[in-house]
């Protein structure tokens, strides 16, 4: 059992989640926790779905606490079963929220270490080969302001840690970024 005291290991995952998300449950000790019946219901449904290895579609409005309602049962299930979980989000901002805010809380609650990684789509990464090619042909491809932007991307590229668009301190125009971002046919 990964969840600490107060969680009976004989309970189903759904029941453990109902308890964890209750007004006096495991999450109640967290300073950010606010009891939400919808969140509790969702966490229980996710737990039940994982136990049954069945599909689940959930729709919930803003402020329900969806992230924790799917993260905690999935991480618990993964640690207990030795299986992996993948969380796909619509935005990189939500991915980063999961990684920087929600998963640290889940890690603390889990009481056992687990690994998490942020994976972004290929178009979010600069392609060194395409960047070099664009620089060589910038006079033919870009206006003077776009060429300046390309040079700013080059300067950033020389110091970036991960080569992702979100690592930039400016937002390049779509035209320039499309000429230097990673593509399956060209970049490896």
Spans of features found by a protein language model:
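A substrate-engagement module of RecA-like helicase motors
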Residues: 2-29, 82-188
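Conserved pre-motif I regulatory segment
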Residues: 6-58
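Alpha-helix capping and helix-loop boundary segments enriched in small/acidic/polar residues
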Residues: 33-37, 58-65, 90-94
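Alpha-helix initiation/capping motif
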Residues: 36, 65-67, 127, 164
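Walker A/P-loop NTP-binding motif
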Residues: 47-48, 68-81, 101-105
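Walker A/P-loop
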Residues: 51-73
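Short, surface-exposed connector motifs at secondary-structure boundaries
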Residues: 52-56, 80-86
């Amino acid at each position: 059992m990964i969840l600490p005291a107060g969680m009976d290991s004989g309970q189903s995952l759904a029941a453990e989640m109902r308890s964890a998300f209750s007004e006096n449950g495991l999450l109640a000790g967290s300073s950010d926790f606010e009891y939400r019946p919808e969140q509790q219901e969702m966490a229980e449904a996710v737990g039940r779905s994982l136990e049954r290895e069945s599909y689940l579609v959930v729709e919930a409005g803003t402020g329900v606490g969806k992230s924790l309602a799917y993260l905690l049962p999935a991480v618990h299930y993964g640690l207990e079963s030795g299986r992996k979980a993948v969380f796909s989000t619509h935005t990189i901002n939500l991915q980063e929220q999961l990684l920087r805010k929600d998963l640290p809380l889940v890690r603390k609650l889990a009481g056992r270490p687990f690994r998490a990684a942020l994976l972004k789509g290929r178009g979010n990464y600069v392609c060194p080969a395409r960047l070099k090619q664009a620089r060589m042909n910038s006079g033919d491809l870009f206006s003077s302001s776009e060429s300046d932007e390309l040079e700013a991307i080059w300067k950033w590229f020389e110091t970036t840690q991960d080569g992702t668009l979100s690592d930039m301190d400016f937002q390049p125009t779509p035209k320039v970024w499309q000429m230097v971002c990673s593509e399956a046919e060209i970049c490896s």
